[in-house]
Curated annotation (Swiss-Prot):
EC number: 3.6.4.-
Outcome reported for the amino acid change (mutating D532N): In B1 mutant; abolished ATP hydrolysis; does not affect interaction with PEX6 or PEX26
Annotated effect of mutating R812W: In PBD4A; atypical
Example GO molecular function: protein transporter activity
Record bears the keyword Membrane: yes
Name of the protein this chain belongs to: Peroxisomal ATPase PEX6
Tissue specificity comment: Expressed in the retina, at higher levels in the photoreceptor layer at the joint between the outer and inner segments.
InterPro entries: AAA+_ATPase (IPR003593), AAA_ATPase_domain (IPR050168), ATPase_AAA_core (IPR003959), ATPase_AAA_CS (IPR003960), P-loop_NTPase (IPR027417), RecA-like_PEX6_r2 (IPR047533)
Alphabetized UniProt keyword annotations: Amelogenesis imperfecta, ATP-binding, Cell projection, Cytoplasm, Deafness, Disease variant, Hydrolase, Membrane, Methylation, Nucleotide-binding, Peroxisome, Peroxisome biogenesis, Peroxisome biogenesis disorder, Repeat, Zellweger syndrome
Involvement in disease: Peroxisome biogenesis disorder complementation group 4: A peroxisomal disorder arising from a failure of protein import into the peroxisomal membrane or matrix. The peroxisome biogenesis disorders (PBD group) are genetically heterogeneous with at least 14 distinct genetic groups as concluded from complementation studies. Include disorders are: Zellweger syndrome (ZWS), neonatal adrenoleukodystrophy (NALD), infantile Refsum disease (IRD), and classical rhizomelic chondrodysplasia punctata (RCDP). Peroxisome biogenesis disorder 4A: A fatal peroxisome biogenesis disorder belonging to the Zellweger disease spectrum and clinically characterized by severe neurologic dysfunction with profound psychomotor retardation, severe hypotonia and neonatal seizures, craniofacial abnormalities, liver dysfunction, and biochemically by the absence of peroxisomes. Additional features include cardiovascular and skeletal defects, renal cysts, ocular abnormalities, and hearing impairment.
Length: 980
């Protein structure tokens, strides 16, 4: 992409679309024929992601002069500048788009009035844009965010109710406000207060234009900044420039369904404080509080400045600057960083004694040469100002400017110091100080670590070692990184798999080396991931006493007086039960990552999709509800699979078929949104992968249409489960049933009923077969029962379905096992059922053919206190409903009569019998189809259809799976329990 300069053309031609560009004559661009499109993006932005597509027109009648030497120019309107969040004279990257993507479908919103009038040729449109007169708004586009609206585009028009009609050009209101003109003596000595917000880079305070006018300050003026709290007397005021904060370029937001004209990027009364300045001020990065702003009145003017000029007062330059490199686990303190520091101080920097300076290292040659991978392993280096030498400045603190022209820089060694947190360009979830969905755990971890950082922390007894437990991918490392960033601690992450060795002595040496390295960069947190790998012998079966003794010594015998600043250890594990007891007791603090609630999953999804274009039909709240039981890693995998599904959809749609690599790149530059079908496909893939694990919860896809008959049974089940969900106020009255027991002959649809209830009520379904929980090891069976209920609580709202319950919970005292395993399993199951009263969104459904074999304690109130009999279908009407439900997806010949088929069947049939009937009929149809294909009597492309003959042949061979004597026995059992 070539570099170009944007120039505002005023007045902009009224006959030209406001989001088009005019090419002055003599420029390097090709002839602006009909249909020429340019892709624009700000020069400083990453080339990844979509660009803005604009129509390029010739501008010979605009009164412009011939293009001279220098960068090419693009003549634009102020509306386009606002969309790009740029000013006149800004640099952009532009390239000609040979084949802009053609839109296959577009949704237009219009108020009462005329619709879209006739157009000549295709029209370049963008999602969220208001088209020229008559002014419909583009609400949604497919497959790209922007493209050509032409004769091949299918249009859907809807009426905008209660929405303002937004126009891209609004006359004089689009002009920026005039700069403030305030005399310096008019506000001399005035102290103002602003609410601080962490963000921005450099050493400048970012404010809105209206806030700058309210403060009576000039753009780029120097001010003293200090905390407004009375208790913050330990930190001295700092110097900073005041800059107007301009909107940032984000095409996904500007082309969103609800996008509108850009306003101020920051509300009045707020100031965007850079992270380094906030750290040097001693502010809490999460609670900045109020800041006192006072104008820097007394300044110095350089003696070489002569003549009549107007300069804002500023701090003097330092003659000498003595700094120390801050020890960090990410870089060496012995390297030669003269070139890095020289390039950093080519721009004047504010320095004060005791400040921590952040020096970026991106693109520095010295950093690349010092890295064995030839890639930078860290984004910044930190230095601490030890001493400044210069003329005594006026003001509440000694603040200077330092640069390569006026200042001599001296490196005087290394030091131990906390460092500020710096925002990155990555996803807001991983780099956030308070990761969405994990805020409470971060606060809890900070509360454990913070006392050691207080002035009297060295006098505290004990250690601050923390054991963090949670399943894989739940965000343990993210939580530790956020806590370290919040407290200004260095983080040294060490996977315990890298500490394992052939002998105990080698493991001991590695452990001591890691702790020694961590002590050299205090205050720090040493993060040991998968700590359960330590303390095991080579076979992984026994415990290594020597390694455990060394680890306990390193964790517990740290002298707090000699460890200031402190070194704290956080260990993570996904299998706390495998952690040796001696290692676990060395951690006085234990934290567990809780299961994500629906609201937390929603906040994580919003953070992950913050910079992704989404279709208007995507409902993140509904998606979060369907992701019950997911951890942070699963939600990230969901976004990855959704993006892959969107790319596959675009390639298979025919739009990208046959295009060159350049054309596909232009399609990506236009941007394409993630649709609800992409998320649905990705969610299905993840749930299929999870279902391969034992007892993985998921929402089934069985509806009431798949369940024929059983109307009374459906009613009883819905009253038991759906009523508490729709009317939670009844729970305060104690009107809640814990469990539901379905009993009856085999094949009557008990499992299908439970799945249909889970689907219709949007509940997660956890199916458990009774025998699969029984284990040969002592205590393992009871643990399996506990894990089932723990997974259900994590995936709440959830239904636990116990199939073949009589094999899991028989009457106690009658089992023949010598160890009493079944009795203990029943006792554990009873204890878990009693604990469901505190969990309102977990329901238990059991299914059995023999309720008389169950332990009587299971049928008492508060457990399986609702018994529902699911019997066979004995009347033709119920059998017809079941048969219709089974065959509703089949292709039947018009001559097929299901009533006549049932007349040829035995009188008493279960749902499994009718399913067997349809299966046999389908097998007969397949055999007939194969025979016809071999004889050439039927084309291979014709659909397979069931005939009346196929169904009658299957009905003639059908035998009931439950005899009349067995049905009578089940009815006697039903009467027995109904009388109780």
């Amino acid at each position: 992409m070539a570099l170009a300069v944007l120039r505002v053309l005023e007045p902009f031609p009224t006959e030209t679309p406001p989001l088009a560009v005019l090419l002055p004559p003599g420029g390097p661009w090709p002839a602006a024929e009909l249909g020429l499109v340019l892709a624009l993006r700000p020069a400083g932005e990453s080339p990844a992601g979509p660009a803005l597509l604009v129509a390029a027109l010739e501008g010979p009648d605009a009164g412009t002069e011939e293009q001279g030497p220098g960068p090419p120019q693009l003549l634009v309107s102020r509306a386009l500048l606002r969309l790009l969040a740029l000013g006149s004279g800004a640099w952009v990257r532009a390239r000609a788009v040979r084949r802009p993507p053609a839109l296959g479908w577009a949704l237009l919103g219009t108020s009462l009035g005329p619709g879209l009038g006739p157009r000549v040729g295709p029209l370049l449109v963008r999602r969220g844009e208001t088209l020229p007169v008559p002014g419909p708004r583009v609400l949604e586009t497919r497959p790209a965010l922007q493209g050509l609206l032409g004769p091949g585009t299918r249009l859907a028009v809807t009426e905008l109710r209660g929405r303002a009609r937004l126009c891209p050009e609004s006359g004089d209101s689009s002009r920026p406000p005039p700069p403030p003109v305030v005399s310096s003596f008019a506000v001399s000595g005035t102290v103002r207060r602003l609410q601080g917000v962490l963000g921005g880079t450099g050493d400048s305070l970012g404010v809105s234009r209206s806030c700058l006018r309210g403060l009576g300050l000039f753009q780029g003026e120097w001010v003293w900044v200090a905390q407004a709290r009375e208790s913050s007397n330990t930190s001295q005021p700092h110097l900073a420039r005041v800059q107007v904060l301009e909107p940032r370029w984000d095409l996904s937001d500007r082309l969103g369904p609800g996008s509108g004209p850009l306003g101020e990027p920051l509300a009045d009364g707020l100031a965007l404080v850079p992270a380094t300045l906030a750290f040097n001020l001693g502010c809490d990065p999460l609670e900045m509080g109020e800041l006192r702003i006072q104008r820097y009145l007394e300044g110095s003017i350089a003696p070489e400045d002569k003549g009549s000029c107007s300069l804002l007062p500023g701090p003097p330059f330092a003659r000498e600057l003595h700094i120390e490199i801050v020890s960090s686990p990410h870089y060496s303190t012995n390297g030669n960083y003269d070139g890095v520091l020289y390039r950093h101080f080519q721009i004047p920097r504010v320095v004060q004694e005791g400040d921590v300076l952040c020096v970026p290292t991106i693109g520095q040659v010295e950093i690349l040469e010092g890295s064995p991978e030839k890639l930078p392993r860290w984004r910044e280096m930190f230095f601490k100002v030890k001493k400044t030498v210069g003329e005594a400045p006026d003001g509440p603190a000694s603040a200077y400017l330092a640069d390569t022209t006026h200042t001599s820089l001296y490196m005087v060694g290394s030091t131990l110091s906390p460092v500020p947190w710096l925002p990155s360009e990555e996803s807001t979830l991983w780099s956030s100080l308070s990761p969405p969905g994990l805020e409470a755990l971060v606060s809890e971890l900070c509360a454990v670590l913070k006392p050691r950082l207080q002035p009297g922390g060295a006098l505290l007894t004990g250690t601050s070692s923390v054991l963090l437990r949670g399943p894989p991918g739940c965000g343990k490392t993210t939580v530790v990184a956020a806590a370290c960033s919040h407290l200004g601690l260095h983080l040294l992450k060490v996977p315990c798999s890298s500490l394992c060795a052939e002998s105990s002595g080698a493991v001991e040496t590695k452990l001591q080396a890691i702790f020694s390295r961590a002590r050299r960069c205090r205050p720090a947190v040493l993060l040991l991931t998968a700590v359960d790998l330590l303390g095991r012998d080579r076979d992984g079966l026994g415990e290594d006493a020597r390694v455990m003794a060394v680890l306990r010594h390193l964790l517990l015998n740290e002298d707090p007086l000699n460890s200031c600043p402190p070194l704290m250890v956080v260990a993570t594990t996904s299998r706390a039960q495998d952690l040796p007891a001696d290692v676990q007791t060395a951690f006085p603090h234990e934290l567990e990552v809780p299961a994500l609630s629906e609201g937390q999953r929603l906040s994580i999804l919003r953070a992950l999709t913050a910079h992704l274009p989404l279709g208007q039909e995507v409902n993140l709240a509904q998606l979060a509800r369907r992701c019950a039981g997911f951890v942070v890693g699963d939600l990230y995998a969901l976004l990855t699979h959704s993006s892959r599904a969107a790319c596959t959809r675009i390639k298979n749609s025919g739009l990208a078929g046959g295009l060159t690599e350049e054309d596909e790149g232009e399609l990506c530059a236009a941007g394409f949104p993630l649709l609800a079908e992409d998320f649905g496909q990705a969610l299905e893939q993840l749930q299929t992968a999870h279902s391969q694990a034992v007892g993985a919860p998921k929402i089934p896809s069985v509806s009431w249409h798949d369940v024929g008959g059983l109307q009374e049974v459906k009613k009883e089940i819905l009253e038991t489960i759906q009523l508490p969900l729709e009317h939670p106020e009844l729970l305060s009255l104690g009107l809640r049933r814990s469990g539901l027991l379905l009993h009856g002959p085999p094949g009557t649809g008990k499992t299908l009923l439970a799945k249909a209830v889970a689907t219709e009520c949007s509940l997660t379904f956890l199916s458990v077969k009774g025998p699969e929980l029984i284990n040969m090891y002592v205590g393992q069976s009871e643990e399996n029962v506990r894990e089932v209920f723990a997974r259900a609580r994590a995936a709440a709202p959830c239904i636990i379905f116990f199939d073949e319950l009589d094999s899991l919970a028989p009457s106690r005292g009658r089992s023949g096992d010598s160890g009493g395993v079944m009795d203990r399993v029943v006792s554990q199951l009873l204890a878990e059922l009693d604990g469901l009263h505190s969990t309102q969104d977990v329901f238990v459904i059991g299914a059995t053919n023999r309720p008389d074999l169950l332990d009587p304690a299971l049928l008492r109130p508060g457990r399986f206190d609702k018994l529902v009999f699911v019997g066979a279908n004995e009347d033709r009407a119920s059998q017809l409903r079941v048969l219709s439900a089974i065959t509703r997806k089949f292709k039947l010949e018009p001559s097929v009569s299901l009533v006549n088929v049932l007349d040829c069947c035995p009188p008493q049939l279960t749902g499994a019998d009718l399913y067997s009937l349809c299966s046999d009929a389908m097998t007969a149809a397949l055999k007939r189809r194969v025979h016809d294909l071999e004889e050439g009597l039927e084309p291979g492309s014709s659909a397979l259809m069931l005939t009346m003959e196929d169904l009658l042949q299957a009905a003639a061979r059908l035998q009931p799976s439950v005899s009349e004597q067995e049905l009578l026995r089940y009815k006697r059992i039903q009467r027995k329990f109904a009388a109780c």
